[in-house]
From Swiss-Prot:
Protein name: Putative F-box/kelch-repeat protein At5g02980
Domain F-box span(s) in chain numbering: 11-57
InterPro entries documented for this protein: F-box-like_dom_sf (IPR036047), F-box/kelch-repeat_ARATH (IPR050354), F-box_dom (IPR001810), Kelch-typ_b-propeller (IPR015915), Kelch_1 (IPR006652)
UniProtKB keywords: Kelch repeat, Repeat
Origin superkingdom: Eukaryota
The Kelch repeat ranges on this chain: 115-161, 163-211
Protein species of origin: Arabidopsis thaliana
Length: 335
């Protein structure tokens, strides 16, 4: 038989590959693309929602850190909305998190793996014992047993899978064990140093970042970025150098960790006016949410330099009713 007349070998589709190979391939793709991939077929949708996929990502070292942030975009009728900021170069933008709306005023958030804990808060002005957990993979929220003490604006930290909580109007600490699903009272001395440092912020938005094995404090004041060594008695707060010319026109309002080690994200908003009518007045506005990621470099004992890695608009909402303190909370999630 003439070779040219032979039928070509049948082509193999992606879904015909062995299951383990499919998981390995998908695990190497950024989670940013998973919503799009889930639209390919029901099989893909099932694979992307499977625990096996995330176990594979963890096993081959392909987990990613996503920043989840809660915004209050309406001052007249406060309604908190959660977003995620994927770590995708040149494509940073806030994506709404579906089915994640629960967030009491003055509650505390902490995370372990793909789960976000929401602890305490204010209900009609009273501190709450409520606690819940949101699974970022399944987008499901479930209630946890109530805490032993009501708290608002407490501090929380995860150690060995257990949630340690202190402060928030109660001098006693407590710890939640997911295995037994119980809260137990614990001395404050038994909580971690990191948790104690967060508790010391007294309501001020202070972010801790490790730079050259030194844990530094950073915070925003009057729209400027400051830093200090929390145990340094010889000098206080100092301006972060190098970012003044980059961001001096923007009134920074919030600072938090990013997924890049010695880096932070800073947040601000601006109002855009358009469609002027009559005497130049306009009732049409857009509120733009901006974000920048800043990396740090120490130069001597008393100088910290900042470098803007990227800066861009990440979200736009209609109107200009967004409150000044529009960032309610944020947390890093790894999976």
């Amino acid at each position: 038989m003439n070779e040219s007349s032979e039928s070509p070998p049948p082509s193999r589709t992606f879904s015909s590959l062995p299951y383990d190979i499919i998981l390995n391939c998908l695990a190497r793709v950024s989670r940013y693309h998973y919503p799009t991939l889930s639209l390919v077929s029901k099989e893909f949708q099932s694979l992307i929602a499977s625990r096996e996929l995330y176990a594979t990502r963890s096993r081959i070292g392909k987990t990613e850190r996503f920043l989840y942030i809660c915004l209050n975009l309406t001052k007249s009728n406060p309604k908190y909305r959660w977003f995620t900021l994927p770590p995708v170069p040149n494509e940073q933008k806030l994506l709404p998190v579906p089915l994640f709306t629960y967030h009491l005023n003055s509650s505390t958030v902490s995370s372990t793996d793909s789960e976000i804990y929401i602890i305490g808060g204010l209900v009609w002005g009273n501190r709450s014992k409520k606690a819940s957990i949101f699974d970022c993979r399944s987008h499901q929220t479930r209630r946890l047993p109530k805490m032993r003490f009501p708290r608002a604006s407490a501090a929380a930290h995860v150690i060995d899978g257990k949630i340690y909580v202190i402060g928030g109007g109660e001098i006693r600490g407590e710890v939640y064990d997911p295995t037994t699903q119980t809260w137990l009272t614990t001395p404050v001395d038994h909580t971690t140093e990191e948790c104690q440092k967060v508790y010391d912020k007294h309501g001020v938005n202070i972010c801790f970042v490790e730079i050259d094995n030194l844990l530094c404090q950073t915070f925003v004041f009057n729209g400027k970025l400051y830093w200090r060594h929390p145990r340094g008695d010889d000098f206080g707060w100092a301006r972060v150098k190098g970012v003044e010319q980059e961001l001096f026109r923007n009134h920074l309002s919030y600072v938090d960790k990013s997924g890049g080690g010695r880096r932070v994200t800073v947040w601000w908003k601006s109002v855009v006016v358009f469609g002027c009518q009559g005497l130049g007045y306009s009732t049409e506005f857009d509120t733009e949410i901006w974000c920048a990621e800043i990396s740090f470099e120490r130069r001597g004992l008393k100088e910290l330099w900042g470098f803007v890695e990227w800066s861009r608009k990440v979200f736009t909402c209609k109107g200009c009713d967004s409150p000044t303190d529009f960032v309610m909370d944020s947390v890093l999630v790894t999976y």
